[in-house]
Amino acid sequence: MDTPIDTQMQASQDPAARAATPDSEATGYGQFCPVAMAAEIFCTRWTPLILRELLCGSRHFNDLKRGVPRISPTLLSRRLKELQQDGLLISQNGEYRLTPAGEDLRELVMGLGFWGTRWVDTHKSLKNLDPSLLMWDMRRHLDPQPLPPRRCTIQFNFPELSNRRDWWLVVNAGDVDLCQTDPGFEVDLYVETPLKSMTSIWMGVSTVAAEIAAGRFDVSGDKEMARHMQAWLGLSPFAKAQKPAAPVQPTPRVPYLKVAQG
């Protein structure tokens, strides 16, 4: 016979029970359907983004926080504990690693990203600009191969921002570091562009050449690095998703008319 403590422990480890607790942010679906049960784990606020970061290779708490900058440290800790309780994640020696169950969500997370790129209005996406997330993603996907075989320092300046205006990417021996303060190295390439333009390039909506032609992208410094920028810059893994040929127009709602009786 289960004691109250046993019951409490089981409830804390069961996603359906946890979702139904009064202090939870969700109430649970109360269905045996596998879609409902999986959604109680996957669809908790911030969880898909945390899983995205883990699937992209982030292993440490601070790296996860940089990839999801708007989540509080307290809530991130809670979500990581929940993922461990649900069997998707293990923590060992200060590192977080996905279990086979967590890795099995890769196709789902990537599919969600491709769906968003294909069907969500690009203009809506470009309203959610975040220099921290953009530069962190660029650091993660930059390809050092086209760059000169030496330390290369690239400075990005987003002139319209009041703070977090300047960022540096330092590429050395295949490693890429992101700095928010001047690393003290000579800058090989200097880029000045609005954050929206840089985000558009990263998302595959625009290109370096198109933004230069439009007068929204200034680059100076090493000419070879500038010439091959589109090659080493990398793109969002979702950039290759193609938009539908013709935008799907939503069906207009017909106003409800109450007909008088008589």
Regions found by a protein language model. Name each.
Residues 33-71, 86:
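N-terminal helix-turn-helix DNA-binding core of bacterial DNA-binding proteins
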Residues 1-39:
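N-terminal leader segment of winged-helix/HTH proteins
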Residues 84-93:
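A short, conserved structural fragment
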